[in-house]
């Protein structure tokens, strides 16, 4: 059952990348990213309002717990990490072929595995090590094929941006574990819906500020 869910998730992520690429063609990155965060926040806004003003979501999966500054400071940091990853990722996707972006983005789980070893002291099994080796091999082969298309991994700034996005995405995954783990296990113990809902809201606010300061004043130049 979980394997089927993983394949469905991978399929939707594939469509997501294709639609992102199409949206970025002949469009500026910042307004597209703002609209992405805006519509994402609209999805979770009703859950926040219903949870705080009614009892209809009490004891349900969609209930958003009330949080103070202690909880929200961690969520704000998560929004900064994720949004930074998205900005670098969107910029690189606009300038690179999707056949190059997809495989490099697929190395993020490998980065998370390595990060889990370094940060949380976890151990990889044989199959996970095989996955790490295959991911590194695929990057090497991508660098070779990229040269044939005129894309040099060591001299292309868009590739550099893409790797920054992947690293920040992996950091976000490791940070999620810290946020969700109970205090007894060294984490913060935040509610999943609290994090998911409010981090989308904060992302939208950050992007609104970035759009107003960086894009709107120069959009006609």
Indicate residue ranges for each PLM-predicted region.
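Specific alpha-helical transmembrane segments that line the substrate/conduction pathway
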Residues: 78-82, 90-142, 194-197, 201, ...
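Juxtamembrane helix-loop boundary signature in multi-pass membrane transporters
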Residues: 1-11, 110-173, 177, 181
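Membrane-interface interhelical linkers
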Residues: 1-20, 25-30, 34-96, 144-163, ...
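A short glycine-/small-residue-rich loop at the edge of a beta-strand within enzyme catalytic domains
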Residues: 166, 170, 186-192, 196
